[in-house]
Amino acid sequence: MHDKVSRVLLTCGARILDLDRNLDYETERQDEWMILDTIAASAKERVAAAKEALPLTEQIARARELDSNTGFPFEQALAKPGMSFICEAKKASPSKGLIAPEFPYVQIAKEYEAAGADAISVLTEPAYFQGKNEYLTEIRQAVKIPLLRKDFTVDEYMIYEARNIGADAVLLICAILSPMQLSEYTGIAGELGLSALVEAHDEREVEMALAAGASIVGVNNRNLKDFTVDIHNSVRLRELVPENILFVSESGMKTRQDIARLEQNGTNAVLIGETLMRSADKKAALRELRG
């Protein structure tokens, strides 16, 4: 009898511990979502204003006039042997504030291309990153390598818009989309000849990305609660992504040792922003990271 009571108490205690862990997880996620939700809410307001200026039907019509047989150059750039480098053109960020007071974005993009970047990530989010659609359009005219539109996609409108301003890929963030939206937006991007970089922060979001049919999964190493970065997040979550799915590590890579650690773990590409943006010699900085 005593043994039975002990077993029951142990079982109940274990369940309570599991419940506590789940509550801690949900509380932490809510803190992170608050930041993303604020930016996403701003994006929704931006889309509403954009629709007034150019209706969705017109945005769709313009996108469908473009050739959808693109060959998905962004995906091809990441699928090549060895580590691929997505270099970011970014003026500011919520975590670091103003990064580049002087922001010669076209010149930066040209430097990245000359340095051997495989693709360029261009921030177009205006409220928190001081980005503009025009940055991407002008960079598109100046370089030949693929461009990722780095923004907070909250509406199908933004996917058609991305195609029309010259992007080769869009960012889809699991934390601000429902599973249905993620699946739908991934499909729309594919129909337009755009690649979708589906961003996850944890195990649940990786599973969500895979369920939506993502062919490129990116893991953000930044903790959105306190803005610290830990590339072990990518090392840990890489194991959940099948080898036939391209894997991108985002944020926090500062040294050749960081890159080597990710190479050993089967990472296909890294997205690097601040480290390169703060470098006076971007070609030398990228060469050092490549090793």
What are these regions (language model features)?
Residues I16-W33:
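Short, Lys/Arg-enriched N-terminal segments with co-localized hydrophobic residues
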Residues E32-A100:
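An N-cap/entry alpha-helix motif that binds or orients negatively charged groups
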Residues I39, C87, Y112, A162, ...:
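Conserved, mostly hydrophobic/aromatic
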Residues A89, K96-L197, E203-M208, S234-L237:
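N-terminal active-site wall of soluble small-molecule enzyme domains
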Residues V154-I165, R204-A212, M253-V270:
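Catalytic cores of alpha/beta
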Residues N164-M180, V219-D226, T267-A285:
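Glycine-rich phosphate-binding active-site loops on the catalytic face of alpha/beta enzymes
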Residues L237-L240, R278-G291:
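C-terminal helical cap(s) of enzyme catalytic domains, especially alpha/beta-barrels
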